[in-house]
Amino acid sequence: MRIVMILVALLALGGCTRWAMNSHLNNANRAYAQGDCDAVMYNLSKVDRESRSRRYVQPEVSMLRGQCLERQKFYMDAVQSYQFIITQYPESEYAFRAKARLDTLHQLGHDNLAPPATPRPASR
């Protein structure tokens, strides 16, 4: 009987964690709709902490983070978020959306603001 009680308690705790994660993700989406990127980033950091074992949430979190970075004009950081989605989750719908965002940023000229640095040997 004790084993059954312990299993029920563990299942209940797992459900609470998932509920809290979904709540934070919903709050992040609501804040994004209102244009409050600080609240978005705060809620996404909570989702990150609570979803370490749930990798399926990461593409959605990264996509929302990239969109907020774009809104704040941190284009290179947004590009890196989108590239992360494409490399880590190439088959997800978020990879398709990330490619579209990268195309848009490229058309607007925000994807490569400065040429990459070329290393040169120090002169003696």
Q: Model-predicted segments: where are they?
A:
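Short solvent-exposed coil/turn linkers within tandem alpha-helical repeat scaffolds
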Residues: D48-V57, I86-A100
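Bacterial Sec signal peptide processing site at the extreme N-terminus
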Residues: L13-Q34, N43-K46, S51
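Sec-dependent bacterial lipoprotein signal peptides
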Residues: M1-C16
